[in-house]
Design a protein with these regions (language model features):
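Glycine- and aromatic-enriched mobile tails/lids
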Residues: 20, 26-28, 32-37, 50-53, ...
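An anion/pyrophosphate-binding glycine-rich loop and adjacent beta-alpha core
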Residues: 251, 257-403, 474-477
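Glycine-rich loop(s) and the adjacent beta-strand/alpha-helix scaffold that form part
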Residues: 223-282, 451-474
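N-terminal Rossmann-fold NAD(P) dinucleotide-binding loop
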Residues: 47
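Core beta-strand elements of the Rossmann-like FAD/NAD(P) dinucleotide-binding domain
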Residues: 34-36, 214-223, 436
Length: 660
């Protein structure tokens, strides 16, 4: 039976909720903290910052990661920057404006109170990272530098060249290492969570697999924190690292944690296009490039055909024959419109035949104007590593002078096209970041809470560090205040034995199928189904067809999967098979949510619901809520939809406008 979920948002004006919450929350006595264990699954920005912060507070932390070092978490791949409302540029920024831009960018589908809190703590994040030694770019006088990202008309993004995620992760890792050395954090590398253990209705531990030995192990704690990222790799081709998966999140869903807004999947507009059928992942080109790069396609269809045939290059087309379509359609924001808007605009041009590569699925990102105006040295100082990465992959140097027409110098433009990048949906959490399972918390990308239907660029790093450094350390105490009275749990309890036996039984089942198809071949088919039917453009008929195909693919997976090797020891194909099992269920969840939401908003675009100009058309009367899906006991039964009504008090809900 459908339920209405309680987000437990504090009373009072939105600007005072977090301050009031902190003033009245329950605390844990310092001596009692020494008795309490917390499991943190994941060592990316959210997980590492949470583990380090909770360890500093005195809690005993068990921290798990699938890599051989926390430094290999996918947060390291983030390029462009991190948002904060410091207003160093004196350009009109404020906590409220960051809050407003984030809610608007999310197409008014985010929880207002959470977003304001995020904007409020953003400035503390920068101070924390500077104190850790993160080498943010600086102006000549020593002040931290800023640049702009999509969906904003101010410069609020702090950055470290094109390697911001790496530097922020090294900062969090240094704090984590300090706690490991102090004995407050016990780090388990090359371990993967396979199940959550529920005791008396509370999350009290996990079953984890040692990825080297293949052995299953039991771990108990007073609370469990999931920080395992998003589910973009369900699509097979994405900008996510190949190890990224949704197994921990899906296991929590199977055990009773509602999954919120799974259809909100972000398709990033600036990625290197697909170049072959055997490709295993895609490469992101940072949104920061849109500060100085201009996106265009030819105005003339004959020029587009020549580009597709390889008889012309981008540098051969003069300025007057270029269509800078984002600047034309959205003059107030130009190339810095939000990601969902830029991606759909690129798709529209390519669908009309104006694509610029041999597949017709690419547009140009051109730096000629900026290089002519500022000089190549300035551009390389800002984006040098990104230019190097692009050249390494494509053998094209986007900073190299390639042609001169009527006195105007033109460089080789980058070719880009939208690709799966980030997931705004995730495990449902309340204001305290606790799921529908008491004692189970979800932070960072694996929860749904802050971005609505579309995340603004440079806000993922902000949310991950906000949750780990400044939100969870407060809110988890409200739960743990009672736990200090509980006895330490033994992993010999029947709930732990039952959970471990369930995982072992599933491993035996997968190893015993002994079919003929590899994990990758089935995963690639799943990705094709999702991209074709649950991708940038969605329809009722397409979603129903996608669901039908995914159900058939599950049967194929269960009958014809082949996993080489044995269950003991290191077996990467077995681990991938477990991930794929969960990606299939995740793909169905995305489709169910997209099918029920008869509107277009942010990253969810139903082609039946659009304006005459091709923009997203929301239905606030019927869909102004968080869609929360509840598992029904097995993977083949359709989930039940629960709802969390959205309430806005500080912002007027209106149609997004990036034109003026």
């Amino acid at each position: 039976m459908a339920k209405t979920l309680n987000s437990r948002i504090p009373e009072g004006p939105v600007a005072e909720k977090w301050t009031n919450y902190k003033a009245h929350q329950r605390l844990v006595n310092p001596k009692n903290k020494l008795k309490l264990d917390v499991i943190v699954v994941g060592t990316g920005l959210a997980g590492a910052s949470a583990a380090a912060s909770l360890g500093e507070m005195g809690f005993n932390i068990l921290n798990f990661c699938i890599q051989d070092s926390p430094r290999r978490a996918h947060s390291i791949a983030a390029q462009g920057g991190i948002n904060a409302a410091k207003n160093y540029q004196n350009d009109g920024d404020s906590v409220y404006r960051l809050f407003y831009d984030t809610v608007k960018g999310g197409d008014y589908r985010a929880r207002e109170a959470n977003v304001y809190r995020l904007a409020e703590v953003s400035n503390d994040i920068i101070d924390q990272c500077v104190a850790q030694g993160v080498p943010f770019a600086r102006e000549y006088g020593g002040m931290l530098a800023n640049r702009s990202f999509g969906g904003a008309q101010v410069s609020r993004t702090f950055y470290a060249k094109g390697q911001t995620g790496q530097q922020l992760l090294l900062g969090a890792y240094s704090s984590l290492s300090r706690m490991v050395e102090a004995g407050k954090v016990k780090l388990f590398t090359r371990y993967e969570m396979e199940d959550i253990v529920i005791v008396d209705g509370h999350a009290r531990g996990i079953i984890a697999k040692n990825l080297i030995t293949g052995k299953l192990e039991r771990f108990s704690a007073n609370a469990v924190v999931i920080a395992t990222g998003g589910y973009g790799n369900a699509y097979f081709l994405s900008t996510n690292a190949m190890g990224c998966n949704c197994t921990a999140a899906i296991q929590c869903y199977r055990k009773g944690a509602d999954f919120a807004n799974p259809s909100y999947v972000q398709i990033h507009p600036t990625c290197i296009p697909v170049h072959g059928t055997n490709q295993s992942k895609l490469t992101l080109m940072s949104e920061s490039l849109r500060n100085d790069g201009r996106i265009w396609v030819p105005k003339k269809i004959e020029d587009a055909k020549a580009l597709q045939a390889g008889t012309k290059k981008g540098s051969d087309i003069p300025e007057e024959d270029r269509d800078y379509y984002l600047e034309r359609r959205y003059p107030a924001f130009g190339n810095l419109v939000p990601r969902d808007v830029a991606s759909r605009a690129a798709k529209e041009r390519c669908d009309k035949g104006f694509g610029v590569n041999n597949t017709g699925l690419a547009v140009f990102l051109d730096f000629s104007e900026s290089i002519n105006r500022l000089g190549i040295d300035v551009i390389l100082q800002r984006y040098g590593n990104l230019f190097d990465m692009y050249e390494e992959i494509t053998d094209v140097n986007p900073g190299e002078l390639a042609n001169e027409i009527n006195g105007v110098k033109y460089c080789n433009p980058m070719m880009i096209f939208p690709a799966i990048h980030y997931t705004m949906g995730g495990i449902w959490v309340d204001y305290e970041l606790m799921t529908t399972i008491p004692g189970l918390f979800a932070i960072g990308e694996c929860n749904f809470s802050d971005h609505g239907a579309n995340r603004l660029g440079a806000s993922a790093l902000m949310q991950g560090l906000a949750d780990g450094y400044f939100v969870l350390p407060y809110t988890i105490q409200n739960y743990l205040a009672d736990q200090a009275l509980w006895p330490k749990l033994s992993t010999d309890l029947p709930e732990f034995a039952e959970a471990e036996a369930g995982v072992q039984k599933e491993i035996d089942r997968l190893m015993g199928i002994q079919g003929k198809r590899s994990v990758d071949s089935i995963h690639k088919e799943l990705g094709h189904i999702l991209w074709e039917h649950v991708g940038m453009g969605r329809t009722k008929e397409g979603l129903e067809e996608g669901l039908k195909k995914m159900k058939a693919l599950r049967e194929e997976f269960n009958k014809n999967l082949f996993i080489p090797g044995k269950k003991e020891g290191l077996n990467v194909e077995l681990d991938k098979a477990i991930h794929l099992r969960d990606f299939i269920l995740m793909g169905e969840l995305i489709a169910y949510d997209a099918l029920h939401r008869n509107e277009s908003c942010g990253g969810h675009f139903r082609e039946e619901y659009q304006t005459e100009e091709g923009e997203a058309k929301r239905d606030d009367a019927n869909f102004f809520y968080v869609g929360c899906w509840e598992y029904q006991g097995n993977d083949t039964t359709a989930p039940v939809l629960n709802k969390e009504p959205l309430e806005y008090e500080a912002i007027k809900v209106q149609t997004r406008n990036y034109k003026n």
